[in-house]
């Protein structure tokens, strides 16, 4: 149990699957921020995909269904069917890698990283937004609630809107993600209204419902109980010719290349925040390289949605 909400993600293997790369760059914001780099396990001079595909598959029902729906599976003693039902819903909703339906890798990864690394717990995923709540025409990819304590010991809450982009070039991924953030910002009143009207029905635990009510419905003459923030998952092509380097050197090359890339692009992310007057928001950015971003994001989700994974 987090600070009020339960985590939906099964994250115990996350640190084994996603290797974090330490660096010294930041966004220079006055608000809270994260700028974190990860890569998959390197094996035989390439990123090993099997583990992440299995992990996503095992989390698919937690991604697709609300807490209330998952509890219904439990009460019906039918939890074993939740994964297959979730996959069926996704296949009915669209093809693997179809953006906007919840079937694109970035849409699932931004949910996973905001829950697993930020501890901002899910209110709605992209699948839920597109299947359960289409009338609201949400442009977010996931919506989360973060409850934290600042350096002075004062608690604060943030409604975190997630977006993602996975494409060959990191700069292009940043540009695309900020285009999406601006769309979310332009529709923020509608997004917040949707959460306020529907979030309680998606919970089942009375304590969680009461916790959300205290945040989303302020008492008379009281100010807002939360701010809005943005979470980004960015994927790009690594750009290292693995045939030219021995296997034992490849991971060191990956780490060095990622640090070089973030040194180049962190100022650009900060610039995008500044020029779009977004500096009053917290930003949480998670970056993962691929061997071939376009092919890998399709291949991973195709295997997950087919159930063609290693268990």
Residue map of PLM features:
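Short acidic, S/G/P-rich loop/turn micro-motifs used as interaction or catalytic elements
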Residues: 46, 167-169, 238-242, 293
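Extended hydrophobic secondary-structure segments that form protein cores and membrane-embedded regions
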Residues: 161-163, 229-235, 284-289
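A structured, charge-rich N-terminal accessory region that forms the first stable segment of a protein
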Residues: 2-85
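Glycine- and acidic-residue-rich phosphate-binding/metal-coordinating active-site segment common to enzymes
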Residues: 123, 130-214
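Extended, Lys/Arg-enriched charged tracts that mediate electrostatic binding to polyanionic substrates
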Residues: 105-137
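Acidic, metal/cofactor-coordinating or nucleic-acid-engaging core segments within structured domains
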Residues: 174-267
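A short, highly charged nucleic-acid-interacting micro-segment common to nuclease
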Residues: 88-111
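Extended, charged low-complexity segments
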Residues: 244-311
């Amino acid at each position: 149990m987090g600070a009020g909400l339960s985590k939906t993600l099964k994250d115990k293997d996350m640190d084994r699957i996603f290797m974090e790369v330490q660096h010294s760059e930041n966004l220079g914001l006055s608000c809270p921020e994260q700028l974190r780099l990860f890569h998959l396990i390197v094996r035989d001079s390439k990123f090993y995909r099997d583990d992440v595909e299995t992990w996503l598959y095992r989390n698919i029902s937690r991604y697709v269904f609300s807490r209330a729906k998952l509890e219904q599976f439990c009460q019906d003693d039918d939890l074993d069917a939740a994964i297959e039902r979730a996959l069926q819903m996704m296949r009915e909703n669209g093809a693997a890698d179809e953006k906007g339906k919840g079937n694109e890798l970035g849409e699932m990864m931004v949910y996973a990283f905001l829950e697993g690394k930020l501890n901002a717990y899910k209110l709605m995923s992209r699948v839920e937004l597109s299947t359960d709540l289409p009338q609201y025409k949400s442009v977010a990819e996931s919506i989360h609630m973060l409850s934290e304590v600042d350096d002075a010991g004062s608690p604060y809450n943030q409604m975190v809107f997630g977006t993602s982009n996975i494409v060959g070039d990191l700069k292009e991924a940043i540009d695309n993600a900020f285009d999406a953030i601006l769309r979310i910002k332009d529709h923020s009143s509608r997004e917040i209204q949707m959460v306020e009207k529907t979030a309680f029905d998606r919970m089942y635990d009375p304590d969680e419902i009461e916790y959300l009510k205290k945040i989303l419905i302020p008492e008379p003459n009281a100010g807002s109980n939360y701010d809005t923030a943005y979470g980004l998952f960015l994927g790009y092509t690594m750009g290292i010719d693995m045939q030219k380097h021995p296997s034992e050197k490849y991971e060191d090359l990956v780490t060095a290349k990622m640090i070089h890339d973030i040194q180049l692009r962190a100022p650009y992310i900060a610039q995008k925040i500044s020029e779009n007057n977004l500096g009053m928001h917290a930003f949480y950015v998670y970056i993962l390289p691929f061997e071939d971003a376009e092919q890998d994001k399709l291949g991973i989700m195709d295997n997950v949605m087919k159930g063609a994974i290693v268990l």
